[in-house]
């Protein structure tokens, strides 16, 4: 692609979806080698965006509510003022599609996403039933990007030796989206799995944050051999642990 392009990639969250988007991030950078590429993401993932090497700039999306009109005006001013030549909306949510509307009827750049009227719309009616990796690959194919590599966190560097137990271990991550509890596997199933792993000489390592503290404590009580690292790991450290683990379930 031509040098001098200004590209915006939208990927807000959540954690799992952000990781799955690393393949598309790499593909977009390879497709636009001379472009200035900006990532719009949540503050929680901004540091990753700055470190991964695919972006020249990272914008933090504070996701202003409808009661903050001046914040929305500022958001629109920043988007329009950047003079983007193409946008890859990998979030493909109602909110990110609304960002397309902020450019106005005549000022929108080329746009890969689901917004009605955009130049490279992914209009597959079955897209919501596709796996994220396949869905994003098809979306980028519509925009002319044929090859999308597998997700990768190889650029993350963190030491796990101070956290990892001796011998074989497996990561158990019983948390999930707080507003979609139905997606979570029941804690008693994690406890049963932890017992099975421990019986095989594999230490269950429990991962989670403050919202999962109760669940982790419940599993740890049921399986004394488990190592509860709840609240003690950064995202980088979790990735480092995962590289050394025999398995991960979550």
What is each of the regions a protein language model found here?
Residues 1-250:
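Catalytic machinery of carbohydrate-active enzymes
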């Amino acid at each position: 692609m031509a040098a001098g392009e200004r590209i915006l990639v939208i990927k807000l969250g959540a954690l799992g979806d952000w990781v799955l988007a690393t393949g598309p991030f790499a593909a977009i950078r390879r497709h636009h080698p001379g472009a200035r590429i900006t990532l719009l993401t949540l503050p929680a993932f901004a540091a990753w965006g700055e470190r991964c090497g695919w972006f020249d700039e990272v914008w933090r999306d504070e996701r202003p509510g409808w009661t903050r009109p001046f914040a929305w005006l500022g958001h629109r001013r920043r988007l329009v003022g950047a003079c983007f030549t193409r946008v890859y909306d990998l979030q493909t949510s109602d909110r990110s599609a609304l960002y397309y509307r902020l450019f106005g009827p005549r000022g929108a750049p080329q746009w890969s996403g689901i917004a009605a009227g955009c130049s490279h719309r992914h209009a597959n009616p079955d897209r919501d039933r596709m796996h994220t990796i396949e869905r994003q690959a098809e979306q980028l194919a519509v925009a002319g990007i044929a090859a999308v590599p597998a997700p990768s966190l190889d650029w993350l560097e963190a030491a796990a030796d101070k956290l990892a137990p001796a011998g074989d271990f497996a990561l158990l991550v019983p948390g999930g989206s707080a507003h979609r509890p139905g997606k979570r596997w029941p804690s008693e199933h994690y406890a049963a799995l932890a017992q099975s792993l421990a019986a095989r000489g594999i230490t269950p390592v429990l991962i989670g944050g403050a919202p999962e503290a109760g669940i982790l404590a419940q599993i740890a009580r049921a399986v004394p051999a488990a190592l509860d690292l709840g609240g003690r790991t950064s995202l980088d450290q979790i990735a480092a642990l995962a590289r050394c683990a025999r398995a991960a379930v979550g």
